[in-house]
């Protein structure tokens, strides 16, 4: 009986010595984060009256998420995301629509876009002469 107890204790210590470090290593290794199929595209757009974002307080703000599907508080997220995709995310490349007639009254409106577009940080600010000029750009991106 003594030899059996000694043999069992030796076997248990050997198993612990061999398997113990493996168990600890498995517990210490963090699980890999699953890779996303889509690069993040989430933006916050604001509009306010003034010559710059620093001088204007935002009148309205909306969110726009474009991946994997268009969503957010923007009134037309699918169209706004399509506008951005059409210019490869380059907001400066958005042009005014043809045939829009605006008055020359100077009442500056500033628009900001901050967030991430296809995994890249975006920080954009533009001042338009008035609300009509702002609405003539980017068929739906700035229409909120």
UniProtKB/Swiss-Prot annotation:
Role played: Inhibitory activity against trypsin.
Signal sequence bounds: 1-34
Domain of life according to the entry: Bacteria
Cysteines engaged in disulfide bonds, as pairs: 66-81, 102-132
Subunit organization: Homodimer.
Localization per Swiss-Prot or TrEMBL: Secreted
Gene: sti2
Name of the protein in its database record: Trypsin inhibitor STI2
SUPFAM superfamilies: Subtilisin inhibitor (SSF55399)
Principal subcellular localization: secreted
